[in-house]
Amino acid sequence: MKTQLEGDRVLAGKEAVAELYKTGYFGRPREDGLELSLVEAAYLQFRGKIEIELEGRKLDFRALFEQASLRQPNFELKYIVYKDLKERGYYVQPSAADFRVYPRGSHPGKSAAKIFVHVLSERQPLPVKLLQDSVISAENVHKQFILAVVDEESDLTFYEIKTASPQGEMPEPYPEVKTDATFLEDRVIAWDAEASGALYAGGFYGKMLDPERLQLSLVESLYLFSRGIIVVRDRKDRIFSFDEFVEKASEIESSFLRKYGAYKALRDSGHVVKTGFKFGTHFRVYRKVESIEKIPHSEYLVNVIPSDYEFRLPVMSGAVRLANSVRKRMLFAVEKEEGVEYLDISRVKM
């Protein structure tokens, strides 16, 4: 079947509607025939279904690929993903998100598409704002959002990305105690044995320095300080104000306030939040800890990122792979003017 390359589309005659669209749902019917996207046309040419001409000259697969790459950004990446999905048995159509994918056993006209697929090279940065907008747009129309990443060897990795609203099950975010604590170099120590035990056993705050004293992280300390649970003094016994604590903590760790915002949101929603250093993340998060003698596995790993953050996909891939390998969900907490928003990213098989 002869077709014509025009701009970023390939045009076929009316006979293509019956042969290509009604049997395989390729392209979009028009009054005068069928309009194919460049990836659809390249796939059909690869399968020997069509011939493509440009200004009277027949294009072989190489010539078409070169022309398409000039006419459409990321063409080769999109072709790799499109061909992979087709060979997995999916009906795939181009869309604003790159592709919409229909459930197995279904097709256009039988049911709605289930998945939006966005395609990127492993080398391309991904602004978190763009990612959030894309995910929310998909969820607003009840679609699953999949990010297809093509590495330098043209292997594919698929990630499901969705918004999240994690809810913990701790009955109270902190026990009803009040005690003094001292800000040392980069952590805080509570000295009272009874209060230390209550904070550790009742809310899994900090780590016991010994049977009587509790050492607290900076974010834990500010959270308890803000609720009147601890009074924080410096090493000369001067009491800190809230702003003074924030200033000193921010000198120690430049991202302190951002981390604290996520810590506060997670604690306020009923979680137990501990450092995620051993996993290379900011936090590991538990839905509920009933006993410090029998601590369960954490549910999430959380990285806190600013609203103007750009994902580097190899870094994102490493974080997600580690989280999935230890049976945890990887959440990215995006800083907002008030609170945080979460993106849940996991590796999936198509």
Swiss-Prot record:
Residue pairs linked by disulfide bridges in the UniProt entry: none
- Which residues catalyse the reaction? 286, 297, 328
Tell me what reaction this enzyme catalyses: pretRNA = a 3'-half-tRNA molecule with a 5'-OH end + a 5'-half-tRNA molecule with a 2',3'-cyclic phosphate end + an intron with a 2',3'-cyclic phosphate and a 5'-hydroxyl terminus
What is the enzyme's main class?
A: lyase
Q: Which Gene3D superfamilies match?
A: 3.40.1350.10, 3.40.1350.150, tRNA intron endonuclease, N-terminal domain (3.40.1170.20)
Q: Name one GO molecular function term.
A: lyase activity
Q: Does the keyword tRNA processing apply?
A: yes
Pfam families, sorted: tRNA_int_endo (PF01974), tRNA_int_endo_N (PF02778)
The subunit structure is:
Homodimer.
Primary role = Endonuclease that removes tRNA introns. Cleaves pre-tRNA at the 5'- and 3'-splice sites to release the intron. The products are an intron and two tRNA half-molecules bearing 2',3' cyclic phosphate and 5'-OH termini. Recognizes a pseudosymmetric substrate in which 2 bulged loops of 3 bases are separated by a stem of 4 bp.
- Family membership: Belongs to the tRNA-intron endonuclease family. Archaeal long subfamily.
Write down what this protein is called.
tRNA-splicing endonuclease
Tell me the organism: Methanosarcina acetivorans (strain ATCC 35395 / DSM 2834 / JCM 12185 / C2A)
Q: Which gene encodes it?
A: endA
